[in-house]
Amino acid sequence: MSNIRDVAKAAGYSVATISRVLNHPGSVSPATREKVYEIMREMNYTPNTHARGLALDKSNSIALLLPDVLDRSYIKIAKGIEEIAHKKGYFVFLCNSENNADKERNYLDMLIRGRRVDGIIMVNSLLEDRELYALQKENLPFVLAGRKRSLQNINAVYIDYLKGGYQAASHLISLGYDRIGYISNKSCAPEDEEKFSGFKQALKESSLKLHPEYIIEAEKSIRGGTLAAKKMLLETDSPEAIFVSCDPAALAVLKYLDSNNKHIPDDIAILGFDDVEMTELVSPRLSTISFPAYKLGLLSARLLFDDIDNQDYESQEIFLQTKLIIRESCGHGSTAY
């Protein structure tokens, strides 16, 4: 089994340099770090993270707080975070808040009181701004990922959900649809509220009426989408198009309408949000709003470890954009946003 001296010899550096890469990577140039990491991978060398953690008063673990561990987009985010953490020799503790703010607070309380982790990544946190500012005083590195917050000096990677909702409605409007419905997440998650705000903004700019009877809350699931579609069809005048706030529900809407002899998109157009894999496997293929979930995870983890490894670290904000993916479920159109 390889040891640190073997790695130093293969990389052409001193043992002290290898030790700095492992324990204080911020003090070593990126080129040197990458070379050492590559040699470590080639030699299958794994540092003794427990011993290092004891020496440095570190746990060599981070926590990831997710609103829903079954959500495909959150799984992609987790994959990006875990990939970076693994390269750094860190474990990732997964905490599922189930879109419950109190449960999220309980997790944070346990993590902070016991100093069980060296940092935390919070995806679409339900905490209020004042609570996040209070968290800063705990001297525990953390990163906010997902929806935009009006906070200063916070490590964050944001997704513009409002723009995503705006893109969705704008695309449907550009295809000539006037009566447009919206199926939202029943949990009233803040990111879904932002999507709805963008949706309403696009309708207002085009002087289109917002039909309350076409606005339906549903569970973020196949069952939720099915029930919402059923309710939509009970209306005397069905909407011409529907924007669904998540792809699983959108796919369920598509299936239900098809089974009730509604032709997509000729009778009703459907547009989702997330761009999960199944959107390309149904017929017609689902148009959707995509966001770089995996990249969000990667960048969030990098920000967190930069903070953990550097005492003089200054917080950063990174903004990622949504993208309209045009397929067949809305009809033919060449407009992209």
Which residues make up each language-model segment?
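Bacterial carbohydrate/catabolite-sensing allosteric modules
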Residues: 1, 42, 80-93, 112, ...
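N-terminal helix-turn-helix DNA-binding module of bacterial transcription factors
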Residues: 1-60, 73
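Short beta-strand segments enriched in small/hydrophobic residues
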Residues: 17-20, 54-70, 171, 179-186
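Short beta->alpha connector loops
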Residues: 45, 101, 123-128, 248
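Amphipathic helical "hinge" segments at domain boundaries
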Residues: 46-111, 118, 200
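Active-site-adjacent beta->alpha loops and helix N-cap segments on the catalytic face
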Residues: 127-136
